[in-house]
Amino acid sequence: MNEKLRELNVEFLFSAVLQLHTMEECYDFFEDLCTVPELRAMSQRIHVAKMLSEKRVYSDIVSQTGASTATISRVKRSLDYGCDGYKIVFERMDAEAAEKAEAASGETDGKE
């Protein structure tokens, strides 16, 4: 973790985010906290990170996200040399999606 980030205001923000339980709560909180361009920039970066982690090529990422190659390069640097924050989130999201898919297939398997 970058020690430059460790300060009370940042920890307060992270504690606040950890209090959110639903997608609707996230929408409400982040709409209050951020401007629309800030939210779009963050969502674009995480989408770029996901595509890079799936080994997608820059041209596909540019066309699907509208991100500049400079943004893609910065995100790639974070994936390669960062604190593995993206990796942790993507692993958890993938595990949750797999659990939901398994539960859904179990529901359909039992139906006649």
Residue ranges: model-predicted function:
Residues 89-112:
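Intrinsically disordered, low-complexity basic tails/linkers immediately adjacent to helix-turn-helix/homeobox/MYB/SANT
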Residues 20-24, 36, 55:
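Residues at alpha-helix boundaries and the short loops/turns that link adjacent helices
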Residues 25-44:
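Short, Lys/Arg-enriched anionic-surface-contact patches
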Residues 9-13, 29, 71:
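A general alpha-helix detector
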Residues 14, 69-96:
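C-terminal structural segments of small proteins and small subunits
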Residues 60-65, 72:
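Short alpha-helical "recognition helix" segments of helix-turn-helix
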Residues 1-20:
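General nucleic-acid-binding
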Residues 42-56:
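Short, amphipathic alpha-helical "recognition" segments used to contact nucleic acids or chromatin
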